[in-house]
């Protein structure tokens, strides 16, 4: 079951200007240590694109949670890392993790799906939060849909 969905579009230059103006103060406030280490492997436009995608993913996740950056959800509570195959993954802590727990129905576990892309001047991210039954928990039977052939379509007119 889909619990939430969020999308964010970010101007890469907006992140670049914030980095130029505030430097490490901005980066340390917004991004986790792991996010900074990942983005700082790159230089120039690729570095800013990496930061902008992560910014967009944080925004999209906050929207999917239904909280925005309020009710105790902070930018640092949403971390973006890359899994073993390179695909982005979200790691929640603090207020974001608590919001996810409140959103997730009993007997279910949440799965966070994230997709990110950048094509200057933009960076984009989309987050979908879905719930699935916990392992070993019997879920309610799903409604079945029966599709009849169109042979009887004339009867519908």
UniProtKB/Swiss-Prot annotation:
Belongs to the P-Pant transferase superfamily. AcpS family. Transfers the 4'-phosphopantetheine moiety from coenzyme A to a Ser of acyl-carrier-protein. Its cofactor is Mg(2+). GO terms for cellular component: cytoplasm. It catalyses: apo-[ACP] + CoA = holo-[ACP] + adenosine 3',5'-bisphosphate + H(+). It is found in: Cytoplasm. Keywords: Cytoplasm, Fatty acid biosynthesis, Fatty acid metabolism, Lipid biosynthesis, Lipid metabolism, Magnesium, Metal-binding, Transferase. One of its GO terms (molecular function) is holo-[acyl-carrier-protein] synthase activity. Mg(2+) binds at residues 8, 59. GO terms for biological process: fatty acid biosynthetic process. Its EC number is 2.7.8.7. NCBIfam families: acpS, pantethn_trn. It holds the Pfam family ACPS. It is an enzyme of class 2 (transferase). This is Holo-[acyl-carrier-protein] synthase. Disulfide bonds: none annotated.
